Amino acid sequence: SPEGFYYVKDGIDQAISRGLAYAPFADLIWCETATPNLEEAKKFADAIHAKFPGKMLAYNCSPSFNWKKHLSDDEIATFQTKIGMMGYKFQFITLAGFHTQNIAIFELAEKYKKEGMTAYSRIQQNEFAREKDGYTSVKHQREVGTSYFDAVSNTISSGKSSTTAMEGSTESEQF
């Protein structure tokens, strides 16, 4: 290429070749497909397992796939079970948090424009309701470790720090 790279022929055969080359040295082998494709996933898994039985595989249930364009609702619902049976033990969605955060804040912005603080308060009430299920981010200062940094500051200053954040904070008083 003009940048000095070598061109390679991509595709499942090249992925299998690389997977087999790395298998002796890797804990698990990851194959990236262009679409959510069970046939390619099986071909890759079968080829790796033929030479390395039981080798764990990884599959990116990618946000770059238009899932509904390629699969029915039933196929989407069973996709992970099916690849799991092929040996794909590590299944993940790259950038799931990115997409989830962005659609959530976009929807909040739309509602905030129309409803003002009521829109945000509704989200906050949902956070409170979800604490019983293990949700912990209501107390955002705690979540980001503010108490830890307060302890470090107090340790360094022999308990005389004037820049701590938690003691007397709105979070400690209201939540």
Q: Where does each model-flagged region fall?
A:
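Alpha/beta enzyme core
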Residues: S1-F92, I105-F106, E110, T146-F175
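P-loop/Walker A phosphate-binding loop and immediately adjacent motor/lid segment at beta-alpha junctions
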Residues: D46-L57, K114-E115, R122-Q125, A129-R130
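Short acidic/histidine-rich active-site segments
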Residues: I93-F98
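C-terminal helical cap(s) of enzyme catalytic domains, especially alpha/beta-barrels
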Residues: N102-T118
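Flexible C-terminal active-site loop/helix
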Residues: G116-E167
